[in-house]
Amino acid sequence: MDDENNYFFDIDEEHEEKRSFVVICYDIQNNKRRYRFSKFLEHYAIRVQLSVFEAELSPKTYKELVAGIDRFTNEDDSIRLYRIGGGREVQSWGKDSGSKIEEVVII
């Protein structure tokens, strides 16, 4: 990737492998809980859509984020965290659509 298109991943190669790019999206029914969750996410990530955040996190910060998400979990809601570049891991909390993705392609 050339430097002008690499604005989000502007880190040196030594630390590049240790950080993960994550996308967090959610569907929380309760207004108060949804507001509190978005405020929580603002400490870790950048809002890119109404219910979608992106972040580039160290392993320690990633673990903190995941641990904090548990406080907002409700069986009627859906919170999904996509870890891109770090094992291609997807975690979800609450209501699950039941869909299983065999292969993920990010364009």
Enumerate the predicted regions with their spans:
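Basic nucleic-acid-binding interfaces
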Residues: 1-4, 8-23, 29-107
